[in-house]
Design a protein with these regions (language model features):
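Non-catalytic DNA-recognition/assembly elements of restriction-modification systems
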Residues: 1-46, 168-182
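Short, surface-exposed loop/turn microsegments at beta-strand edges and helix-strand junctions
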Residues: 39-47, 67, 81-83, 100-113
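A short beta-sheet element
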Residues: 92-134
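A short glycine-rich beta-alpha junction/loop motif
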Residues: 108-115, 148-175
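A structural connector/turn signal
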Residues: 75-78, 104, 151
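Sequence-specific dsDNA recognition surfaces
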Residues: 22-37, 54-85
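Short, positively charged
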Residues: 125-160
Length: 182
């Protein structure tokens, strides 16, 4: 079978579908903050930034954290990768987990230590994907292989994330799993 298209196979009598993540989603690397700074302060607009520490705090039930901001060149605002409700972010450095963005994250800049993922309508429940990426044994194995090395900073590559094979049961099954996980 080729990794370039969906694979149908039989598992316990049912047809299963698998897709490359890049086939069913829009994957966008976060922005390098230094590249969006205005040359002149008066030409900038202030935007909140999504951080790994915010996501970790939220996982631990802490909601009263400080939100850092960045001054953005007004000409570059339309090209910003901003957080949207129900999209996914994956931490590329240290965090190495998928998180579903909620209403409180909307409009925050997604910086370069994240990749954001938006699924094509009706293909993937974001909460199911978070479970699949964070907990599925095969994905955990792939993540561990990807972050091995001699470097003190363990980084996931955007290419590795794009090439992940994702099992896609029907949407109602995905939603059931996602509800249990979140």
């Amino acid at each position: 079978t080729s990794r370039d298209y969906q694979i149908n196979y039989f598992y316990e009598g049912a047809v299963r579908l698998e897709f490359l993540l890049e086939q069913i989603s829009q994957i966008t690397h976060g922005v390098v903050l230094n590249r969006i700074k205005p040359k002149i302060l008066s030409e900038g607009a202030e935007y909140p930034i999504l951080t790994i520490s915010q996501l970790i705090d939220e996982e631990n039930g802490v909601w009263d954290y400080e939100v850092p901001t960045a001054l953005v060149d007004k000409k570059k605002v339309k090209n910003l990768n901003l957080a949207k409700e129900h999209s996914i972010v994956i931490g590329l450095t240290s965090f190495h987990r998928a998180a579903v963005l909620e209403k409180q994250h909307e409009g925050k800049i997604i910086p370069s230590n994240f990749v954001s993922i938006e699924f094509q309508n009706g293909i993937m429940d974001p909460y199911y994907f978070a479970w699949y990426f964070n907990e599925h044994p095969e994905i955990k194995r792939q993540r561990m292989i990807a972050i091995q090395g001699n470097s003190s900073v363990k980084v996931l590559s955007v290419h590795m994330i794009r090439q992940l094979m994702i099992e896609c049961p029907n949407l109602s099954t995905q939603m059931s799993i996602g509800k249990l996980y979140y």
